[in-house]
Amino acid sequence: MVLIRVLANLLILQLSYAQKSSELIFGGRPCNRNEHRFLALVYSDGNQCSGTLINEEWVLTAAHCEGNKMKIHLGVHSKKVPNKDKQTRVPKEKFFCVSSKTYTKWNKDIMLIRLDRPVSNSKHIAPLNLPSSSPSVGSVCRIMGWGTISPTEVILPDVPQCANINLLSYSVCRAAYPEYGLPATSRTLCAGILEGGKDTCAGDSGGPLICNGQFQGIASWGSTLCGYVREPALYTKVFDHLDWIQSIIAGNTDATCPL
């Protein structure tokens, strides 16, 4: 089975395939306080996701993180002990690849959010640049988030967890999930540890996949049992959506995503 890693009302919704909109990093360690200045904690309708600040006014996350009463928190490390420079925003506008907000297991799970007002750079807040090149298979990638740290129950950490995983060939994910008939090509990335033990999980959806220092992916979906052997996760490929992202930010709200 597959998990769309969303943490709904602090419960993992286990569907026939579920997305990671609310996952914690399974098999990780607490992130360094200063290594995730771009990481956003996103809440909507009782669900938890992550996002990535790409400039003072825009955040990227997963489309399946969409919900009402959304709040976006920046500058967060410990949930219990807020940083003095924490800033909270709500969406001014949300943009999706398609007007119906639909997405598939292999395409269009991306949402671009314009904040109601810009955030200020600070000790714990700074944007992450968009990628300048496409990632290579074999790259070491960093994942992070406040999602559950257990594959079988909801155990949420106070601080974000970080872990290193590997960028794998997309064919590995096709082979791992034959029941979903993934297409031969896709605008998603396949990443994980084939031996298992490290993965995004429920509550981590929408968070970044950072490969060799570049923001390359958005946590989308994966195995119901996070970190399971030979069942890596899939991430929306940021590089393939650069034209769409940059066009929207420039004011061309009619821009369309790549097919």
Swiss-Prot record:
Keyword Hydrolase: yes
Signal peptide extent: 1-18
Location relative to the cell: Secreted
Complexes and interactors: Monomer.
SMART domains according to UniProt: Tryp_SPc (SM00020)
Database matches in Pfam families: Trypsin
Higher taxonomy: Eukaryota, Metazoa, Chordata, Craniata, Vertebrata
Gene Ontology CC terms, in alphabetical order: extracellular region; secretory granule
Domain Peptidase S1: 25-250
The name this protein goes by in its record: Snake venom serine proteinase 2
Tissue and organ distribution: Expressed by the venom gland.
Biological processes per GO annotation: proteolysis
Native source species: Crotalus adamanteus (Eastern diamondback rattlesnake)
The protein's enzyme class: hydrolase
